[in-house]
Amino acid sequence: MGSSPSSAPVYLPDSNHERVKILVAGPFGIGKTTMIRTLSEIPSLHTEEVMTDAAAHVDELAVADKKTTTVAIDFGRLTIAQGRIVLYLFGTPGQRRFKPLWSDYARGALGALVIVDTRRLADSFEVMDLIEETGLDYAVAVNQFPESPAYDEETLRVKLDLEDHTPMVICDARDWDSSLNALRALAAHLVTRAGGNL
C-alpha cells in the first residue's frame, strides 16, 4: 500500500499551470503527513520532531505509538489534469497551540481536506470549526485504521454534524489511489460550490 518515487521534476518548467493551494487538516496523529507523503510527486517536506515528555502537558497524546509530530507544516506537490493543474498540499499541525497560525495557513487556499478517525471523531470538531471560520469549503476523508469502528455514512455524517453538501469519503492515507479519490471529492465539491467556474 505504499507509494513509489515519482519521476516528476522537482522544479516546474515555466508554463501555464494553474496552481492551487489545498490544506490537508485534521487533529494530531490522524494521517496528514502520511497522506501528503503518499500523494506528493516530489520528495515531500515535513517539519517533524521527536515528541518528548515535556510536551505531554501541551499536546494531548491521543495516539500512544506516535513518536514524532509536525511542528510547522507538511508540504507536497501533485500535478493533475494532464499537467494543467498543480496542487500544492499543505498539511497543518493538529495541536491546539497552532490555532493562531490558521489564518496564515488558509491564506490563498482554495479548499481543505479534513481527515478524521472514527476512534476519535470529537477531536475533529475543533479543526472543522477552524476551517469554517476561515470560510474555506472542505471535504471530509475518514482515514481507516485497523482498529477503527465502522459506521455507515449516515451515522458518520450525524456524528460529525456535516452539512448535506459536504462530501465525505472513506480513505486509507497510505494508499495513493484512495488518497487521490479523497482529493477528487474535494475538487468536485469546489467546482460545484463555484458554480462550475474554477
Which residues make up each language-model segment?
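Conserved G1/Walker A P-loop phosphate-binding module
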Residues: 2-64, 78-79, 86-87
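A structural signal for isolated positions on well-ordered beta-strands in alpha/beta enzyme cores
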Residues: 23, 139-140, 169
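Residue-level signature of catalytic and energy-coupling elements of molecular machines
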Residues: 35, 91, 172
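Conserved NTP-handling cores and scaffolds of large molecular machines
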Residues: 39, 43-46, 135, 190, ...
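Switch II of P-loop NTPase G domains
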Residues: 70-76, 82-113, 117-130
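Conserved residues in the N-terminal Rossmann fold of short-chain dehydrogenase/reductase
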Residues: 89, 142, 170
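Conserved C-terminal guanine-recognition region of P-loop GTPase G domains, centered on the G4
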Residues: 115-165
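Canonical P-loop GTPase G-domain recognition
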Residues: 146-198
